[in-house]
């Protein structure tokens, strides 16, 4: 049995096919979703989406949004998404280093919040290239 996964951004369809299982980063932690999962709607955090397809795990960097799960269909609506295989490792590492430097020199509440969000996005992109597990 499989799940139909759709990952959508405002500009494009990033993924639209059947999968065996996913692990989704939500605002309250990671959740694993298998076929016949209970219906749920949840906020999606900036983080990694892990997709199991043909007994292999693929990764995708998600930049926050919402997900709806029900009837073996998963719809993930996010601000932006990138498949781990599409991310340039060198560019992602440079972006991470720049984001870390910006956090250190940020002044004022707004700059600190924006710098920390940029750092979280940069870390997520690097993690999508080099998954821990």
Curated annotation (Swiss-Prot):
Gene Ontology cellular-component terms for this entry are: chloroplast thylakoid membrane; proton-transporting ATP synthase complex
The uppermost taxa in this organism's lineage are: Eukaryota, Viridiplantae, Streptophyta, Embryophyta, Tracheophyta
| HAMAP family, per the entry | ATP_synth_epsil_bac
Q: What is its main location?
A: plastid
SUPFAM superfamilies, per the entry: Epsilon subunit of F1F0-ATP synthase N-terminal domain
Which protein family is named in the record? Belongs to the ATPase epsilon chain family.
Q: Pfam families this protein is in?
A: ATP-synt_DE, ATP-synt_DE_N
Q: Which UniProt keywords apply?
A: ATP synthesis, CF(1), Chloroplast, Hydrogen ion transport, Ion transport, Membrane, Plastid, Thylakoid, Transport
Q: Which domain of life is it from?
A: Eukaryota
Membrane-topology descriptor: Peripheral membrane protein
What this protein is called in its record is: ATP synthase epsilon chain, chloroplastic
Its quaternary organisation is: F-type ATPases have 2 components, CF(1) - the catalytic core - and CF(0) - the membrane proton channel. CF(1) has five subunits: alpha(3), beta(3), gamma(1), delta(1), epsilon(1). CF(0) has three main subunits: a, b and c.
Q: State the organism named in the record.
A: Nicotiana tomentosiformis (Tobacco)
